[in-house]
UniProtKB/Swiss-Prot annotation:
Plays a role in virus cell tropism, and may be required for efficient virus replication in macrophages. Belongs to the asfivirus MGF 100 family. It comes from African swine fever virus (isolate Warthog/Namibia/Wart80/1980). This is Protein MGF 100-1R. It comes from the Viruses.
Amino acid sequence: MVRLFRNPIKCIFYRRSRKIQEKKLRKSLKKLNFYHPPEDCCQIYRLLENVPGGTYFITENMTNDLIMVVKDSVDKKIKSIKLYLHGSYIKIHQHYYINIYMYLMRYTQIYKYPLICFNKYYNI
């Protein structure tokens, strides 16, 4: 397997249909020293300043939407991208990609940062 980035992609997929799964997710995130509740926006902004570039998480919320937060390396603005799953393809801004690696290879100028989205799409 070819390693494309300094830090490997970490994906956490879950559904909030059961409390046991949510507890398991929180426990897993605490092991990674990464957990910020979505209602605490200040924590998210702090996280974006402190997390090393190239580390990011893709998370699935209860509506099967994938959310990825990115920070532009030029203007430093924080942007959120909504990913849609279509079979084995990912659709981002009307373009289809076989997997997330293909998207990241095309847009290498943005840093990837994590955000946990539990039940709705948050605009930052």
